[in-house]
């Protein structure tokens, strides 16, 4: 009951903050939560956004952003795990396997772009296959490696917002980081600071309400032991003017208002 009350409370906050813009279809997006479990209390990597950016200025966030059209064409070290693909294909609207790959690869790309941290594996052909946003991978002789990703949650920004996202939240262990690009974090960057923060600590209390909900789901998953693909994946979305928390693959209502 306490969990339900918290979700309802956060939904009311979302409605209060809403600008009530005309309907905008949410854009696919991906977020990556990196976890360090080397200590007694797990830590997650958060970045502080520049105070001049449009979306959530000055807030602590997890790296993430919109899916690019080219993400599904990026060469990888191996296909995304079948169990991960199955989770990404659950829910409505139905998507193709190529879109599932795009979501997973977007999470890796955004993490590299915003934090300089690369999840990849060595490949002799990397330099000739990657360019643009993937240049740091090519220079390090890496191809992106999605094998360590797990889907934690899906959340859709409520109607009435000018910026709406259909976000898949992924997590990966810090041990999956194989390369760091220097100079990505600086005073004029999108993220001006990176911090490893213990789950449950005060700095995380200022996260966006929906992000706190997702982090709470991750904390529960971590408490049960190693991450598994067969765990239930929550889906936060609005239906009938109210926020719902369903389970992907088990939702009883279509997301007509998404």
Region locations from a protein language model:
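N-terminal leader/linker segments that precede catalytic domains of diphosphate-processing enzymes
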Residues: 1-258
